[in-house]
C-alpha cells in the first residue's frame, strides 16, 4: 500500500499515521511529533464545528476536500502559516494539522529562520513555528506531499503509541480528544484551552 492510500481514512486514523512521519522541505528534515485531526461539515461523516471546512467548500478551504495527501495551508490570525495534510476520500472534508516536529537535519538553516535565541526543542513547536522552521509558505497550498519532486515531501513511518487530548485553542468541539502526540518529546506544545470555549465537559 502506498503512503497516500494510508491517509484515505477517517481523520483520527490519519492523524495516528502521520505521527512519526518524516517531513522534508527546503534544506530541513523533521519528524512529526504532534498533530490534530479535523473533520468537516454537518452533512459529512465527521461533523466538526472547529474545522475550516465546517461550512462547506470555498476558495480558501477547497484543499481540505481532497484529494488525500495535498497540503492545506492557511494563516493563523493573519500572521503565522500553518500546514495540514488532507485525508479521507476525494470530495470528503478532513485534514490533519501538523503541530510540532523534532528537527533531524538542517539545524543551521532552522536557526537562521527562527532566530539565534530560539532553543532547539522549540524550533518547530507549534504549527506556526513548524512552518517557519521548514520554510513552508502559503504558496505551498495544494501541493502533493507524496510526489517525489514536491518541495514539501512526507514519508510515513511505523505507527507509534501516542497520547490523545483536546485540541489547542479551539472554541468549538473543544473537548474532542483529537490532538495526538508522542510521549516524552520536549518539542510538543503546551495545551491551552480557548477562552471562548465552554468549560471542560460542556463541549463535544
Swiss-Prot record:
Key words of the record: DNA damage, DNA repair, Hydrolase
Gene3D superfamilies hit by this protein: Methylpurine-DNA glycosylase (MPG)
One annotated GO biological process: base-excision repair
Gene Ontology molecular function: alkylbase DNA N-glycosylase activity; DNA binding
EC code(s) of this entry: 3.2.2.-
Protein family (similarity comment): Belongs to the DNA glycosylase MPG family.
HAMAP family linked: 3MGH (MF_00527)
Cross-referenced PANTHER family: DNA-3-METHYLADENINE GLYCOSYLASE
Annotated NCBIfam families: 3mg, PRK00802.1-3
Name under which the protein is recorded: Putative 3-methyladenine DNA glycosylase
Organism of derivation: Mycobacterium sp. (strain KMS)
Amino acid at each position: 500500500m502506498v503512503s497516500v492510500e494510508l491517509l484515505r481514512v477517517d481523520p483520527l486514523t490519519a492523524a495516528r499515521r502521520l505521527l512519526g512521519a518524516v517531513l522534508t522541505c527546503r534544506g530541513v528534515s523533521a519528524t512529526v511529533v504532534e498533530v490534530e485531526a479535523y473533520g468537516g461539515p454537518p452533512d459529512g461523516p465527521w461533523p466538526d464545528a472547529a474545522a475550516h471546512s465546517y461550512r462547506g467548500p470555498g476558495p480558501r478551504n477547497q484543499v481540505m476536500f481532497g484529494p488525500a495527501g495535498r497540503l492545506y495551508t492557511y494563516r493563523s490570525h493573519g500572521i503565522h502559516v500553518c500546514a495540514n495534510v488532507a485525508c479521507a476520500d476525494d470530495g470528503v472534508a478532513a485534514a490533519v494539522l501538523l503541530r510540532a516536529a523534532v528537527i533531524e537535519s538542517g539545524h543551521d538553516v532552522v536557526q537562521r529562520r527562527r532566530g539565534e535565541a530560539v532553543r532547539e526543542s522549540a524550533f518547530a513547536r507549534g504549527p506556526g513555528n513548524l512552518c517557519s522552521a521548514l520554510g513552508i509558505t502559503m504558496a505551498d497550498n495544494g501541493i502533493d506531499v507524496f510526489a517525489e519532486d514536491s518541495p514539501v515531501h512526507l514519508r510515513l513511518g511505523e505507527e507509534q503509541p501516542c497520547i490523545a487530548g483536546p485540541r489547542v485553542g479551539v472554541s468549538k468541539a473543544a473537548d474532542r480528544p483529537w490532538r495526538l502526540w508522542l510521549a516524552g518529546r520536549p518539542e510538543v506544545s503546551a495545551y491551552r484551552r480557548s477562552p471562548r470555549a465552554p468549560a471542560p465537559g460542556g463541549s463535544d
